[in-house]
Amino acid sequence: MELLIQLTSLLLIVIAGPLVIALLFLKQGNL
């Protein structure tokens, strides 16, 4: 069960990471 939680958290980090960076770049570009 812990392995599944670790995999899902890792997947969230892998997906959310680039999204947050893209949002930051968009905000800087709009300014």
From Swiss-Prot:
Which compartments is it annotated to reside in? Plastid, Chloroplast thylakoid membrane
Pfam families named in the record: PSII_Ycf12
Cellular component terms per the entry's GO annotation: chloroplast thylakoid membrane; photosystem II
- Membrane topology per record: Single-pass membrane protein
Q: Where are the transmembrane segments?
A: 5-25
Q: Where is the signal peptide?
A: none
Could you tell me the Gene Ontology terms of the biological process aspect for this record?
A: photosynthesis
Q: Name the protein family.
A: Belongs to the Psb30/Ycf12 family.
How does this protein assemble?
PSII is composed of 1 copy each of membrane proteins PsbA, PsbB, PsbC, PsbD, PsbE, PsbF, PsbH, PsbI, PsbJ, PsbK, PsbL, PsbM, PsbT, PsbX, PsbY, PsbZ, Psb30/Ycf12, peripheral proteins of the oxygen-evolving complex and a large number of cofactors. It forms dimeric complexes.
**What is the role of the protein in this entry?**
A core subunit of photosystem II (PSII), probably helps stabilize the reaction center.
Please state what the protein is called: Photosystem II reaction center protein Psb30
